[in-house]
Amino acid sequence: MPQIKSAIKRVKTQNATNKRNASELSKLRTAIKKFKNAVETDSKEDVSKLHLEAVRALDKAASKGLIHKNKAARDKSRLTKLANK
């Protein structure tokens, strides 16, 4: 347990950031799972809408530093490949 005032504050902010990041990553994973489920069920109109949502979620995560920009690009490429099948 930290004793210094600034260290105590830092622990509080780290915990808040950790919760926020976990929530954002969960939203990202959910968007990707919804898209993949739509691809498996072959619902064309849902696929295009959910593809946009998944790509948007990846871009947001990359811009916030939750995932690396190259991982976002790789995942977007894979999702687009699935959408075009």
UniProtKB/Swiss-Prot annotation:
Recorded GO terms, molecular function?
small ribosomal subunit rRNA binding; structural constituent of ribosome
Output the Pfam families linked to this UniProt entry: Ribosomal_S20p
Compositional bias, Polar residues, is annotated for: 13-22
Identify the stretch(es) annotated as Disordered: 1-22
The biological process GO terms on file are: translation
Q: What cellular component GO annotations does this protein have?
A: cytosol; small ribosomal subunit
Gene3D superfamilies this protein is in? Answer: Ribosomal protein S20
SUPFAM superfamilies for this protein: Ribosomal protein S20
Q: Which InterPro entries match?
A: Ribosomal_bS20, Ribosomal_bS20_sf
Query: What keywords is this UniProt entry annotated with?
Result: Ribonucleoprotein, Ribosomal protein, RNA-binding, rRNA-binding
- Alphabetized HAMAP family for the sequence: Ribosomal_bS20 (MF_00500)
Q: Give the NCBIfam families listed for this entry.
A: S20 (TIGR00029)
Family (UniProt): Belongs to the bacterial ribosomal protein bS20 family.
Q: What does the UniProt function comment say about this protein? A: Binds directly to 16S ribosomal RNA.
Protein name, UniProt field:
Small ribosomal subunit protein bS20
Which species is the source of this protein?
Lactobacillus acidophilus (strain ATCC 700396 / NCK56 / N2 / NCFM)
Q: Which gene encodes it?
A: rpsT
